[in-house]
């Protein structure tokens, strides 16, 4: 992969910096692992907006990704690497020895033809999935389960990884990308290495229309709204908010902690640093 700056043939192309990925498959995705996906535009079943700034965008198929890696002991070969419009990471299409094909999140450094395997006896190599009890302390891992057998929930975005700090009894301590240290059961599986497409965060989309293609709608500042729409709204002419920043519903923003899940507080060894948003 490499970053290139395109020629400024128009105002919309002038700021574009894109990731060149010649290793990705140029054809269609593997059809048996596709599902139809309808647009929700951030609405719930009542038609009310539950997530702002969503709507439109190009049609997409959902790729069924294997987050469980439960074909233990059966070797697989990476048939090809593919683009996935639903996530920042790329996908790797695996062909198992029994003929089954599955998508996984493509780890960094794994190329076409690589041999991967999952299970307790798998070698410590990028792309292999093992329980945390069998992974050496200090290893870099991704696609981590929070409950055994539930499937990976942590560290699935492009370029992310987690460090295995220690093991104490039935739990392992992990340092997440945010800086938080969390306890996870040692029977939970994780994949060795870090997620690929690490240059994803360095790209520049270049124009507003390209963001709309991704299903993202504009964000309107509260200070330019009316008082009925936002606490920062109103005033004669161009005025400041006159208060600490708040959300449209009056909750403090810009660093205000909103976590309310007390049930899993005992799984956190230390919170993320205050300056990490």
UniProtKB/Swiss-Prot annotation:
Superkingdom of the source species: Bacteria
InterPro entries in the cross-refs: NA-bd_OB-fold, Rib_uL2_dom2, Ribosomal_uL2, Ribosomal_uL2_bac/org-type, Ribosomal_uL2_C, Ribosomal_uL2_CS, Ribosomal_uL2_dom3, Ribosomal_uL2_RNA-bd_dom
SUPFAM superfamilies: Nucleic acid-binding proteins, Translation proteins SH3-like domain
Keyword entries, A-Z: Ribonucleoprotein, Ribosomal protein, RNA-binding, rRNA-binding
Biased amino acid composition, Polar residues: 43-53
Region (Disordered): 35-60, 225-277
Membrane spanning stretches: none
Signal sequence annotation: none
Gene Ontology, cellular component aspect: large ribosomal subunit
One GO MF term attached to the UniProt entry: transferase activity
Keyword Chloroplast: no
GO terms of biological process kind: cytoplasmic translation
Presence of keyword Chaperone: no
Quaternary structure note: Part of the 50S ribosomal subunit. Forms a bridge to the 30S subunit in the 70S ribosome.
Family (UniProt): Belongs to the universal ribosomal protein uL2 family.
Free-text function comment from the UniProt entry: One of the primary rRNA binding proteins. Required for association of the 30S and 50S subunits to form the 70S ribosome, for tRNA binding and peptide bond formation. It has been suggested to have peptidyltransferase activity; this is somewhat controversial. Makes several contacts with the 16S rRNA in the 70S ribosome.
Name of the protein: Large ribosomal subunit protein uL2
Organism whose genome encodes this protein: Methylobacillus flagellatus (strain ATCC 51484 / DSM 6875 / VKM B-1610 / KT)
């Amino acid at each position: 992969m490499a970053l290139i700056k395109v020629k400024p043939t128009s105002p919309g192309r002038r700021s574009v910096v894109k990731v060149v990925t010649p290793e990705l498959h140029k054809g269609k995705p593997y059809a048996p692992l596709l599902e139809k996906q309808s647009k929700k535009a951030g609405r719930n079943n009542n038609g009310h907006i539950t997530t702002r700034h969503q709507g439109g965008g190009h049609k997409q198929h959902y790729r069924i990704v294997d987050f469980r890696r439960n074909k233990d002991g059966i070797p697989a070969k990476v048939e090809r690497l593919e683009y996935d419009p639903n996530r920042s990471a790329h996908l790797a299409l695996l062909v198992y020895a029994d003929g089954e094909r599955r998508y996984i999140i493509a780890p960094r450094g794994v190329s076409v033809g690589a041999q991967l395997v999952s299970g307790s006896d798998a070698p410590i190599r990028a792309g292999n999935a093992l329980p945390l009890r069998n992974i050496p302390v200090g290893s870099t891992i991704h696609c981590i389960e929070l409950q055994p057998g539930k499937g990976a929930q942590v560290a699935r975005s492009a370029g992310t990884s987690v460090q295995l700090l220690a093991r104490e009894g039935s739990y392992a301590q992990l340092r997440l990308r945010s800086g938080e240290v969390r306890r996870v059961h040692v029977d939970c599986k994780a994949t060795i290495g870090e997620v690929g497409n690490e240059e994803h965060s360095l790209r520049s989309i270049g124009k507003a229309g390209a963001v709309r293609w991704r299903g993202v709608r504009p964000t309107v500042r509260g200070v330019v709204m009316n008082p009925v729409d936002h606490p920062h709204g109103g005033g004669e002419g161009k005025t400041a908010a006159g208060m600490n920043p708040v959300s449209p519903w009056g909750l403090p923003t810009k660093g205000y902690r909103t976590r309310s899940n007390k049930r899993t507080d005992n799984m956190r060894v230390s919170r993320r640093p205050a300056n990490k948003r």
